[in-house]
Amino acid sequence: SLVAHVVDGSLDGHAISGMAGVSNIGTERNWCGHPFGAANWYAFGRLAWDHRLSSEQIADEWLRMTFSNDDRFVERATSMMIASREAVVDYMTPLGLHHIMARSHHYGPGPWVGLSQTDGRADWTSLYYHRADERGIGFDRTATGSNAVSQYCPPFRDLVASVETCPDELLLWFHHVPWQHVMKSGRTLWDELCSRYNRGVESVRAMQRTWDDLSEYVDPARAEHVRALLRIQEKEARWWRDACLLYFQRFSRLPI
């Protein structure tokens, strides 16, 4: 069943139902720190009332009430918002990588966390999750590894259990894949990993250009605030890309 059918009560025939979530609001003047961060708070409330809404519909509503009702602004800003999640995935954890952030504060890259004996319990470290070595990268959760894949029902279990059919975005979560494995794109795994990290950085730069074009529809203070935050994001996207690729290159021994 869809989670939505649990929330609306239709799965078990409940007349009264609800949902709970962790808020991202705080003491900042704009509540969420980032002007666009409030969109997540708004989306939670809207989905609690109507889970059938699409991301595009929610973004359209929020943008019109927050920045401008001009269609020329809303159309491009909506596209920017919809693309933003995959941009972050690309420059932080592409192809199903996971939990490779720095220790304790979780801010910034840390694929090397686990090399030191002071890095805490093994299954909380980056090394435990990415398992990069000279042969490849990724966590084998199939029958030849942890067999975590057995917890899923078919047909999803069968889909992800095979390297050949597993979606790219889940590949390294379920499989330890050789560096020279040929991906669906025709690139090797290593080249695809490099491509995804670079694509993430370029996506942020595209958002910067889009926001520069859209700033005329927004008051100067908020326009500059978002512009400044995008500069930080672009810098941090490069930080993630460079740190992760240079670390993984120690094992792949292939050119970036």
Give the role of each language-model region.
Residues 2-256:
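Catalytic domains of carbohydrate-active enzymes that cleave complex glycans
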